[in-house]
């Protein structure tokens, strides 16, 4: 497995190592998701959200940008705080139950994306800073599947998340994508970690 040593694999949940992902139902509570969405919609209504510039916060409504029909925030204080506060809970969820010892995770970055109708996510795997990643559904108007490559079967698996559900995945190893969104909006938080050597 690229980028993750045998020693690191032994620290991780066997399903995470074998399949490349774990579904964590109700990882965030409903009130927490509601709060995060309230903050997101307040940010969307702010003057800074008008006009998209590639690589910055804003809504990308044209076809030339990397993330068509999305509004993105990278490293915002609320998401960075969440990245650090959830570190131990994420390590607990990722641990190998046989050892009982959570892996040591180092936070790398946080990212939030609000997808608008027609948005899609191209097939990709993540950069080296994303060894263990979570994508967390904060809210939606409609269900929207994410497809992840199952490392065992080498086939795509459809995952449907409800608000509060998290998908933990080995970001450098697992390809993933979303088809065009058939709904008004879908709010997703990404938190990324690397494993201690």
Give the label of every model feature segment.
Residues 64-72, 82-147:
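Conserved double-stranded beta-helix
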Residues 15-18, 106, 185:
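A short, polar/charged loop/turn motif at coil->beta-strand junctions and beta-hairpin connectors
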């Amino acid at each position: 497995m690229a980028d993750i040593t045998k020693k690191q694999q032994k620290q991780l949940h066997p399903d995470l190592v074998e399949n490349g992902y774990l579904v964590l139902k109700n990882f965030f509570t409903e009130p927490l998701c509601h709060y995060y969405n309230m903050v997101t919609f307040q940010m969307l209504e702010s003057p800074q959200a008008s006009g998209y510039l590639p690589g910055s916060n804003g809504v990308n409504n044209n076809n030339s940008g990397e993330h068509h029909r999305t509004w993105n925030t990278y490293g915002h204080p609320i998401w960075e705080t969440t990245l650090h506060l959830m570190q131990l809970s994420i390590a607990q969820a990722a641990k190998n139950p046989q050892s009982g010892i959570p892996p040591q995770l180092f936070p790398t970055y946080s990212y939030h994306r609000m997808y608008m109708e027609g948005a899609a996510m191209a097939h990709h795997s993540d950069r080296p800073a994303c060894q263990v990643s979570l994508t967390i559904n904060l809210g939606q108007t409609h269900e929207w599947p994410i497809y992840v490559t199952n490392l065992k079967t080498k086939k795509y698996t459809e995952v449907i998340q409800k608000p509060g559900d998290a998908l933990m995945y080995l970001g450098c190893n697992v390809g993933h994508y979303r088809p065009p969104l058939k709904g008004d909006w879908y709010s997703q938080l990404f938190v990324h970690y690397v494993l201690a050597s």
